[in-house]
Amino acid sequence: MKKIILTLALASFLFGCKTGTTTSKQNDVDVTIDLVNVKEDKVLVSILAPTFTTETATFNIPKIVPGTYSDDDYGKYIEDVKAFDAKGNSLRITKLDVNSYSISDATKLSKVTYLVNDTYDIEKGGGFGESDDVFSPAGTNIDAGKNFMLNLHGFVGYFTTKEETPYKLTVNHPTTLLGVSAMNDLDASDAKDVFVASKYASLVEMPIMYSKPDFTSFMVDDMEIIISVYSPTGKYTAKEITPYMENMMRAQKKFLGKFNATKKYAILLYLSSMTPTDAKGFGALEHPTSTTVVMPEVMGLEMLQEQLKDVVSHEFFHIVTPLTVHSNEIQNFDFNNPQMSEHLWMYEGVTEYFANLFQVNQGLIEEDAFYERMAEKIEQASSMNDKMSFTKMSKNVLKEPYKEQYINVYQKGALIAMCLDIEIREKSNGQKGILQLMQDLSNEYGSKKAFKDNELFAKITEL
């Protein structure tokens, strides 16, 4: 995740349902999202449940999602939750907390329905850590007939003990809107999209943006890059933004070498109108094969390009960590009772360092500009609590006083990565650096194998 804090000058410039008979029991989770019949800015979601052998079932909406490091309680945006048997009879449902519901007679459960409110139109727009807003790139937008930002963790829930069950997602949408995602649409209809995922965690890592068609695609080696843009006034188009982004991503791919194996990568760019009911949190959120980005539409093209270069490159480098190299806490992420990892210095710090290092390495910026950036990080880190253990802060980042120090992962975290890079280069006579270390860790673990938090430093020393 990369958050953008606008300068004071720029900030001043910006000013400021019907239920019928459902299908029979099944062994997957079949979700339908209706983007056609939007009522009062709410979307209906219907879920055909898998088979339960227990008397009760627990249905959950995430409290937190990977990459955000904050409790966002997406259940706050869900209402009118109902459960039904195969004949359409209501089953008793009890709200356990803001994110979870207990369903009685679960052996009869066939269907769950609920309404979803979006997050963009209620954001307060406070500074970093000053409000309870969902970070916009991790949020949701419902603008009937114009735009739907489907960060699926805000629309689709999961049943406890069924997290590993395959998901099928059907999205009914206006024919005037196109859904862009790294997922492949299995339905040829221009009014319905069908996607499948092996489990819940895989599904919610695949955001979709629906808007009037405005996208480009290009190949970088064997990887397809798709850029989709929503600009409410039409100020910017994907065609305008693509050349700059293509140059940057070719440089990233060259810097990474053989690291990235994904065949398709989607960049979903939402440009906010900055009206009171639009997104106010600027930056991006990473996923294994995509990035969601939110920026103010009022930005000039040159500034927008520079911001995109920094934030999108940061998110893309998350392919290295934590999407490839990560701990058990990341591998087995619990959306409602998360256990955080000690190693934000790596997940965010190394990533931020790479996002700057590749630019000088590939000739996108001069050496002096790179040194100036790192000097700024030294200055910014000096205003934080330098005596606080970075691993302890990471492990406890969801609560104070550690939470308020999170932003330091982009400052001190990047500096830790740079120091480690220098140390490795000195000891190897310049033959290795931190990129090689991450490659070695990837070979040791990879995306399917997690490390134990308390063993990482020993493994780094060994390598």
Regions found by a protein language model. Give the residues of each.
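N-terminal, post-signal-peptide region of Sec/Tat-exported proteins
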Residues: P50-A86
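Acidic/His/Gly-enriched intrinsically disordered linker/tail segments
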Residues: H326-D334, P338-G413
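Amphipathic alpha-helical substructures
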Residues: L398-K399, K403-Y410, A414-L463
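Early extracytoplasmic/domain-onset interaction patches
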Residues: T23-I64, N151
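Non-catalytic architectural context of zinc metalloproteases
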Residues: D71-D80, D85-R250, K254-T262, G281-G283
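C-terminal motif of bacterial Sec signal peptides marking the signal peptidase cleavage site
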Residues: F15-G16
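Positively charged n-region of N-terminal signal peptides that target proteins for export
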Residues: M1-I4
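Juxtacatalytic substrate-recognition/specificity segment
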Residues: T216-H343
